[in-house]
C-alpha cells in the first residue's frame, strides 16, 4: 500500500498536465459552442447567455447583466434577439409585478438540445468509466472551479 508521502510524489507532475488539459477542454467547449451557435443562427455569446438563463432559471435583466458583465443596453439587445427567435419570453414576476423575468421557452429549445446530444452521449460514455467516488471527486472539482471562475469574472468586470 502506498504511503501518503509516496502517493503525493508525482502530484506536481499531474497538476502540471491538468492545467493545460483544462485549458484545451475549455477552448474545445468554446469552439463547440460557436459551432452550435452557427447552426442555430445566433452568436455564441447569445447562446451562452441562453444557457445561463436555462441553468439559473427565470432571471431579471439586471441579474443577467450581473452574471455576464454586460451593460444593461447590451442585455436588452440580447433579450430582444433571443425573444425574436422565440427562445425566451418576458413575463411578469408572480411575486412582484414590477419585475420582468426572462424565461427560456423550453418548448422551443429542443432543436438546440438535439445539437448537444451527441456530445452529451460521448461525455456520458467517458463518465461511465469512472467509479462513484471518482465521479464525486470530478463533481467537487467542477463545482469548486466553476465558483472560482465566476468570482474571477466578477473581479474582472469590476475592473480588478
Residue ranges of model-derived segments:
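C-terminal regulatory/oligomerization modules of transcriptional regulators
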Residues: 1-9, 132-160
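N-terminal leader segment of winged-helix/HTH proteins
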Residues: 1-40
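A structural signal for well-ordered alpha-helices, especially hydrophobic packing surfaces
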Residues: 26-29, 127, 146-150
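Charged, amphipathic alpha-helical coiled-coil/dimerization segments
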Residues: 83-136
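Canonical helix-turn-helix DNA-binding module
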Residues: 58-100
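N-terminal helix-turn-helix DNA-binding core of bacterial DNA-binding proteins
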Residues: 32-71
